[in-house]
Regions:
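Positively charged n-region of N-terminal signal peptides that target proteins for export
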Residues: 1-4
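Bacterial N-terminal signal peptides
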Residues: 6-18
């Protein structure tokens, strides 16, 4: 059920982000920005969505868990810097679903290769469910905007 709620939330947010593009011609259209983002004529593009779930191997000491989390966050930063990850974050509960990634890649295979670089996946602490997803191309701008809003680095 939580999985369904998360997906429905993303669908609603994506719809709200893309509504101006669906209303007809857009006087604010910036062709250079659209091309840079890889947008189609509706300002949308294909991504791969990853649901991070609890893996089978989560029994660690506090120190090991903290190091694994640090390595996991470093990997997120590396993928974001490379332009392959446009959004990442945890769910704010202690359920089976731990977080979400939105990969800026066209295929599930590309996303799978990226998830395999995650130390938490390698250690069996997390497993990923990957789904092709169509959303606003504006998401590729999130990481640059985030840098301007974050007082402290993660």
């Amino acid at each position: 059920m939580r999985h369904l709620i998360a997906v429905l939330t993303l669908v609603v947010l994506n719809g709200l982000l893309s509504m101006p593009a669906l209303a007809g011609d857009n006087s604010q259209y910036d062709p250079a920005l659209a091309e840079r983002a890889g947008a189609d004529e509706y300002g949308m593009k294909q991504y791969v969505l990853a649901f991070l779930k609890k893996g089978p191997n989560r029994d660690r000491s506090k120190e090991e868990a903290e190091k694994l989390q640090r390595d996991h966050l470093d990997n997120i930063g590396r993928m974001a810097k490379a332009g392959k990850l446009v959004l990442a974050g945890p769910f704010l509960n202690d359920g089976e679903l731990r977080g979400i990634y939105i990969f800026n890649v066209r295929t599930v295979e590309e996303a799978k290769a990226l998830t395999e670089t995650d130390p938490a996946v390698q250690a069996g602490s997390l497993v990923m469910e990957l789904l092709p997803w169509y959303g606003s191309a504006a998401l590729v701008e999130v990481n640059e905007l985030h840098k301007k809003m974050a007082k402290k680095a993660i």
